[in-house]
Amino acid sequence: MGMATYAVVDLETTGNQLDFDDIIQIGITFVRNNQIIDTYHSMIRTNLEIPPFIQALTSIEENMLQQAPYFNQVAQEIYDKIKDCIFVAHNVDFDLNFIKKAFKDCNIQYRPKKVIDTLEIFKIAFPTDKSYQLSELAEAHGITLANAHRADEDAATTAKLMILAFEKFEKLPLDTLKQLYYLSKQLKYDLYDIFFEMVRQYDAKPLDKSYEKFEQIIYRKQVDFKKPTTNYNGSLKSLYSKAVDQLGLTYRPQQLYLAETILDQLMHSEKAMIEASLGSGKSLAYLLAALMYNIETGKHVMISTNTKLLQSQLLEKDIPAMNEALNFKINALLIKSKSDYISLGLISQILKDDTSNYEVNILKMQLLIWITETPSGDIQELNLKGGQKMYFDQKIETYVPARHDVHYYNFIKRNAQNIQIGITNHAHLIHSDVENSIYQLFDDCIVDEAHRLPDYALNQVTNELSYADIKYQLGLIGKNENEKLLKAIDQLEKQRILEKLDIAPIDIFGLKASMNEIHELNEQLFSTIFTIINDSDVYDDDIHRFHNVFTFETKDILKDLHAIIDKLNKTLEIFNGISHKTVKSLRKQLLYLKDKFKNIEQSLKAGHTSFISIKNLSQKSTIRLYVKDYAVKDVLTKQVLEKFKSLIFISGTLKFNHSFEAFKQLFNKDVHFNTFEVNTSLQSAKNTSVFIPSDVASYQYKNIDEYVASIVSYIIEYTTITSSKCLVLFTSYKMMHMVQDMLNELPEFEDYVVLTQQQNQNYKIVQQFNNFDKAILLGTSTFFEGFDFQANGIKCVMIAKLPFMNKHNAKYWLMDSEFTSTFKEYVLPDAVTRFRQGLGRLIRSENDRGIIVSFDDRLINSNYKNFFEQTLENYRQKKGDIQQFGKLLRQIQKKKK
């Protein structure tokens, strides 16, 4: 890092409009030689009003600035401190432009010689971080940030993270550092000087034994699993007793019974369904059963879970805790499909790609660092999004494996016999095929949260043709000889002529004409679909915020598909007899497109269930065509039921109408299942009241405003009496946002944080909700399950409507052909299951007390009410108006104390 001084600057302002807003706080942390050497901080007075949002964000109020200097009073002092420093900030353009403008207003011309953006640094240094927001970076790297959005603390935190990043860079192998230096020349800011100094000052030494080299890539050496040596001669009961004792848990006979039941089914190669009530301690039970099975038989067990969160909990928390408690070394590994793991040949190809793109350049640098760290090569560790993900996916699709390639999936195959417990998820379990031979090495499988399997199976059997995807894939080939893969082919043809390469001539002009025609045919195809949408009945899917067309003629679509497939075939003929790697990449891309169109064509010709979706009715670019290729029952039977000798399905909500029959009907093979129920919810249900308002009118679309107002009234009553947090569940984004708008306008909620479900932000929102004492979380179907509601006071879940899927929902349409009565056999069981999962958000421990409010009077007035009443039979139920609701809250509050 040398002896340069870095001025790490953070500003708080009245807003983000450069020509209007003012600085109200400045914090500077000075760094030299990886040490903080000085700090500067000042509030800055302004004549502008500070907007309420900025006051809430920064905790800076106008009275705090009354004694502060104006910027022109400290401008010279600040300038003198930073004029010779490298200017550093997180999202540097904002801070740099504001401070340059402020200096200019004081007749000071500030032009830093070098500028560094820590957002750029942190993306490169920490390639697996889920977020690059300062507060989340600080949390991820163990740095305390007590007051985010305060300039002094933000500047200090940014500086500490920058030091961590620089120290990480300095420890990298020299070859990696050199490649980072060359790539950094294409960045927006002056990081290349930093890398140059690091390379120049590098203490030359042999490559550390923990690394190996593939071509130009330095990567972390993979360490094989040792054969497990779990010496234990006792019973499962004594193993369970030791585990709960060492872990400080309560000995629960029902939890032991669950573990013993699972072990017995594994030992006898049985198929079983187990409903273990929410909060019964399923994870510990099945982990101990799987471990005991391995100890007694030497066989390993696959455990499939619903979410990445639960996967991480098992591998990073539960299994390490068991190892410590039992003094074992359990070999457990996350297992996915082959395509989820990196190959070094693919990284090499990406590094050699001359695509001139900022995000691609960042990706190359991230890959160089990530591959020195990752023990697994799991691509999802990179959390790729947007353009980076699309680029990476395309590179995977067109990658022609290099000779002597190193593929991380082979490490898992090599170590499979020494893995005692394999952890996967439902999507991978269902997707696995013959090529994914790792799955064939497991004879025994435990499926947790098994009620979610049908959703993943439906995703697996549904094929999609998206305008945006096809347009992107075609764009990667290009339209002329100056773009993408066509440019590479053009250069190859020139090389053939100049260097007399031993390959057949390539018809560049014919190829260019063909690609232009393919682009035009694709536009014609989606224009045809767009016309069909405009001429058809369109139904809104509010949950997914799409518009769907379910009934349409396919003749014109098939005609356009045939034309584009025919043109792709003729284009592929241009490369007959040419085996050069550049040609192979283009052929692979063209074949990918051809297969995409061909699969859709074959399914439509066969009359498979299909529908058209469009996000914006006026934009052709948002069109997607979906076709269901296979029956969900066929896939679940083939990919799950027939794959394992012993198979145990576990969930808190497998039963419907006191029976497992609804779940059994998801398989098309008559197989005997042993069924068990482990119910620990009886005691916790006694701590829960279910309240059904009598003063809320039955929901009708025309009275939605009145219905929403009633929900808000009950939220007001609840928060006024309890001052506690509340989860409100909806089946419609429209209703959710109507409630949000009303809450934000009411003075009763000025000291409450109102959080709303957002795409790809659920985990973060849940964290925020659990951290605040006064919070209201508004969510849709996602939050009916898989969400641990934490609160010190009374817990409340309000259910706006019973979670039925609408008959215009795509799932309803796609599954309709698989049932005699879709509502009775699929929709109703699904709604009851989701309702039960919603109840489970409330009571997660014996000490929890809470209340469930269901506004939907179908719970007690419909002809299917008894199916829901069965789920509530252990709960205390009360029907009444809002005054009686308030009275009940006070009673619960009194008991809680």
UniProtKB/Swiss-Prot annotation:
One GO CC annotation: cytosol
Short sequence motif DEAH box: positions: 448-451
Gene Ontology biological process terms from the UniProt entry: DNA replication proofreading
Parts of the chain that traverse the membrane: none
EC number: 3.1.-.-
Record keywords: ATP-binding, Exonuclease, Hydrolase, Nuclease, Nucleotide-binding
Limits of the Exonuclease domain: 8-161
Domain Helicase ATP-binding span(s) in chain numbering: 241-496
Molecular function as annotated in GO: 3'-5' exonuclease activity; ATP binding; DNA binding; DNA-directed DNA polymerase activity; helicase activity; hydrolase activity, acting on acid anhydrides, in phosphorus-containing anhydrides
Primary enzyme class: hydrolase
Signal sequence residues: none
Domain Helicase C-terminal span(s) in chain numbering: 703-893
Family, per entry: Belongs to the helicase family. DinG subfamily. Type 2 sub-subfamily.
Record's function text: 3'-5' exonuclease.
Name recorded for this polypeptide: 3'-5' exonuclease DinG
